[in-house]
């Protein structure tokens, strides 16, 4: 019963904040939880969901390459600017930090509760999004802003 109330509270907060992603995610979890197969489905989503999400984001990121909007010329150009080097460095940093984070979660599963709560708070109240590769872009943006190197398009 507690999990239903917790999810309902998250849904209410998401609705009040008008956060479409969290509304959809919570609604999907509530529907899945109501299904007779939830005991089989939810653990699979818990174990594999982050990887599936990263895959979907990766596909979206690769589409400009597939459509020809980004090619080797743009890749080489990225390495000619401080912003490009910072972006590559942030990508590497996030990958390393993520590996350390996975290790921490394996050693301290109770951290998941704090991370989930913090993520919900950030998504709902600070208009953030729960994503991995996008974090690298956010860190890059922060560093570029500090050094006044934000590319203007």
From Swiss-Prot:
Keyword Cell wall biogenesis/degradation: no
Subcellular location: Cell membrane
Major location category of this protein: membrane
InterPro entries: UPF0756_TM
Membrane topology designation: Multi-pass membrane protein
TM region(s), chain numbering: 4-24, 52-72, 85-105, 115-135
Keyword match Cytoplasm: no
GO CC annotations on file: plasma membrane
Keyword annotations from UniProtKB, A to Z: Cell membrane, Membrane, Transmembrane, Transmembrane helix
Family, as annotated: Belongs to the UPF0756 family.
Name of the molecule in the record: UPF0756 membrane protein LCA_1031
């Amino acid at each position: 019963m507690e999990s239903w109330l917790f999810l309902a509270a998250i849904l209410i907060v998401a609705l009040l904040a008008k956060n479409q992603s969290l509304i959809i995610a919570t609604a999907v979890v509530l529907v899945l939880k109501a299904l007779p197969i939830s005991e089989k489905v939810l653990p699979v989503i818990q174990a594999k969901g982050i990887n599936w999400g990263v895959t979907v984001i990766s596909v979206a990121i690769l589409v400009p390459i597939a459509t020809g909007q980004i090619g080797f010329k743009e890749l080489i150009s990225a390495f000619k600017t401080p912003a490009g080097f910072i972006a590559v460095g942030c990508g590497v940093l996030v990958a390393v930090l993520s590996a350390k984070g996975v290790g921490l979660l394996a050693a301290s599963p109770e951290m998941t509760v704090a991370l989930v709560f913090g993520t919900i708070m950030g998504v709902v109240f600070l208009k953030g999004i729960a994503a991995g590769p996008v974090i690298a872009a956010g860190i890059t943006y922060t560093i570029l802003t500090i050094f006044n190197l934000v590319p203007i398009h």
